[in-house]
Amino acid sequence: MDRNRQLLLVIGVLFHFFYLWSIFDIYFVSPLVHGMDHHKSTWTPPAKRLFLIVGDGLRADKTFQKLTHPRTGEEKYLAPYLRSLALNNGTWGISNTRMPTESRPGHVAMIAGFYEDVSAVTKGWKENPVDFDSFFNQSKHTYSFGSPDILPMFAFGDGVVPGRIDVCMYGHEFEDFTASSIELDAYVFHHLDELMHNSTTNATLNEELRQDGNVFFLHLLGPDTAGHAYRPYSAEYYENIEYIDRKLEEVIPQINKFFGDDQTAFVFTADHGMSDFGSHGDGHPDNTRTPLIAWGAGVKKPIHLQDVSNLEEQLLKQSPENSGFESTYFDTWELDHLVRNDVNQADIASLMAYLIGANYPANSVGELPLGYIDADPVTKARALYANSLAIVEQYFVKEQEVYNHQFKFKPYSPFEEKSIQKYQQEIESLIDQLEKSGSGSKDEIEKKVIAKIEELMKTTLDGLTYLQTYNWLLLRSIVTLGFFGWIVYSFNIFLKLFVLNEDELKIPPEFSVTLVGIFGALAISINYLLFYQNSPFNYYMYAAFPLYFWYTILNEKKYLITGIESFLHGISNTTKFLIVVSFIGMYEGIAYGFFERVMFSIILIIIGLYPLLVHGAHKVSGLMKTIWFITCLLMCTFTNLDPVKIESLFQINVGTILALIVSIMGTKQVFKRTQVGPIQKQLIIAQIAIIPIILFATNISVLSLQARTGLPLYSQILGWITFIVSLIVLPILHFLNPSSDYQLRLLIIFLTFVPTFIILTISFELLFYVGFSLILLQWLSIEELLKFSHKDLVETFEKTGKLPKGYWLQVIRITIIGFFFLQLAFFGTGNIASISSFSLDSVYRLIPIFDPFSMGALLMIKLIIPYVLLSTCLGIMNHQLEIKKFTISTLIISTSDFLSLNFFFLVRTEGSWLDIGVSISNYCLAILSSLFMLILELISSVVLSGVEYNSDGTKLDFEPISYRVRKRKVT
């Protein structure tokens, strides 16, 4: 491999991996600090113990609203007991979670009061215990029951007091999506009952259970499992909620009877919700709205709206429109007559700490929700003040950390205007007044002190954000220079690899002492600055790339200028302008398409017209132009369909029939025009024969799973056999008996992936696969007709020693269209705006037991298949244009980061969690597109190894005209 190509690959991979992570280092750095003193929530705890009950994946609306049961048709409340607690015994509201709406971040927020950065979902669960303080760690002892994915992460770790947290959990084999999810929750209730029963015969255990400050954590995974498997509107999901409600109605009185002192507090909530699609992770309201009900010792009883003094203000506060809900969201809840107390999920940790008098978790940023507390004004004020001091403690530690590593530190201006000490003096003075005041003025003073404490908390949290983003300007400038540097640097390598001739490259760049001195001084200065700021290793890499890129660019500017002249040789200024407009238009259109998929439809229509507009359009027949335009119109259908798909056996069967028809017709055409050996014929017939077999297995699996009878073993085995044979065994046999015809090779690749798509599709994905294959095949044919003929290339080369004028224009066009198809391969069936657009329904046909890595691998295979088709197409394009391997992909790589740069500046840290999540996902997908191009044509070089092109009888590893031009002597 050429040294420049090796350099491009190595540096390209490193650059994109490091810069992929840059948004997390800049925008989403965890505010985690260590070394704070603890602050006790209250010296007069109202409860001796607390039960935290978490319904994993439980939506707020399904918990409270009246619903029609899908199995019985009865209109009912699914959780009448929990509703009765909200109506008669405690306080209720909506707990608003943050993105990512996954189990680990959700539990960390409610138990530690801390929002992990977005990268938390990459840390796993059991294998990565939380590395910060938690409410459990501040309890006397915690007894936890439930899932092996959740319990261990709080029970182990450097900061956990050994032996403080007990875990009782089932094995992973219990998490079977085709079995009853109720069994998971039954396990929890059974073992809680067993624990209390054992204490009657074990005096030591009995004494331990009755200690003040104990916590009992019941993690109920059933709703999440049922929601994933059957959707949150299914009978299974509803029945799981009903089961939890019935068991709580039994268990709560038993708990009160067991302890016999009415000193138990209860909190019922969820870690996240569940989308209608049966997934979670993004910021959709169905995922972020969870129920919260608290009752028992220390919790305020329900307050009727008619009893509040500021009725108008309260009505305005909890009206759907003013509190961020749809106008009809609460319509059937029949809780409108009660005060609703909504909280942020991290506030739950502060509430629980107060109820049993524990220290606030050291890293908690939650605010004690006073609406849930039944206490006198002074107690509430002191508890909230202690809460604020715990947050102030974090600010002091973080400020010192930043101050120690800055040449010149600029303090947070609001605390310059009014110091924390001043806030403390005012608050303590107001609390003293509150203690001494009479009943007449107490309410007014209480409002003042609470407002002052909340002001301190908000200012402190804003101050923490200020400290977190202290070096934003420097880092964003470095990363921006890095992106622009990479774009120019990689384009320069493209020119050296594919455009400049060898004699031009033999003249080395002149050594410039000035240039070395300038960049040497810059490197020393930036590295010293980063060292002084105690920056992590990643920061040094962010700075190293732009320094290297821009030094190389300026040092090799002669290559860049000469190469651009050769690349644009013979292209008019008007055409150059149109090229720039096309590049900008395509990349900006794609960027907009990340938010509105309809833009991909508009671009497809424009691409459908391009054979009419380009030079040489007369070479393409009217019939081919018409078929091409119709195909582009049909492909628009997929980018307008809802990416959140519902399983449809009808669409699966229709897609399979279409794939079978295309397979048979394609086979007949290839057999007619190509001499195919007997072994290859048998293998292709076997590939086609597998299609109805795997369709049969898929139908059996889908019908059984939809009927809730589980996954039949024989259909699972048949599915795996056909999956492995079609994807692994038959391709290997083809490899052992290779064909040199490129159309036959394309047919084999198409047939290889049809069975995989059948068993892993839930809706229209197979139809998209067939359409995408056909549009790529037509694109190949059109570009073959539009290219310079081999004869013209040879004649021009022999006369001038150069390529024809405008030769690279077709490469530019293919690059623009190819990058669009790279995005279409994903957006044709998916939408990055919703993590929930990836369904697990299909993988249940092969893996019914919860196994995130295996399930994720199957989904990745399904996502990668269209890219393999595209890589094969680009590989053949290189040959058709008689250019070297990797020419097209290298040009795409050098320009595609304009899209990444777009999304780097569109990353959001404020607004809805859906918007924040989308901005992160967009950036990651854009930068991975560039990285993925490095892999695509490597794949094509493997799958097209030894293929011959019939028009000139040469192989794909022939020496193309463009390469002979590069080797000519400079005259």
From Swiss-Prot:
Its main location: endoplasmic reticulum. GO terms for molecular function: mannose-ethanolamine phosphotransferase activity. The chain crosses the membrane at residues 9-29, 478-498, 511-531, 534-554, 575-595, 598-618, 620-640, 646-666, 683-703, 717-737, 746-768, 814-834, 857-877, 886-906, 924-944. Its EC number is 2.-.-.-. It is an enzyme of class 2 (transferase). Residues 1-8, 499-510, 555-574, 619, 667-682, 738-745, 835-856, 907-923 are cytoplasmic. GO terms for biological process: cell wall organization; GPI anchor biosynthetic process. It is found in: Endoplasmic reticulum membrane. Signal peptide: none annotated. The keyword rRNA-binding does not apply. The keyword Transmembrane applies. It comes from the Eukaryota. Keywords: Cell wall biogenesis/degradation, Endoplasmic reticulum, Glycoprotein, GPI-anchor biosynthesis, Membrane, Transferase, Transmembrane, Transmembrane helix. It is a multi-pass membrane protein. PANTHER family: GPI ETHANOLAMINE PHOSPHATE TRANSFERASE 1, PHOSPHATIDYLINOSITOL GLYCAN, CLASS N. Ethanolamine phosphate transferase involved in glycosylphosphatidylinositol-anchor biosynthesis. Transfers ethanolamine phosphate to the first alpha-1,4-linked mannose of the glycosylphosphatidylinositol precursor of GPI-anchor. This is GPI ethanolamine phosphate transferase 1. The gene is MCD4.
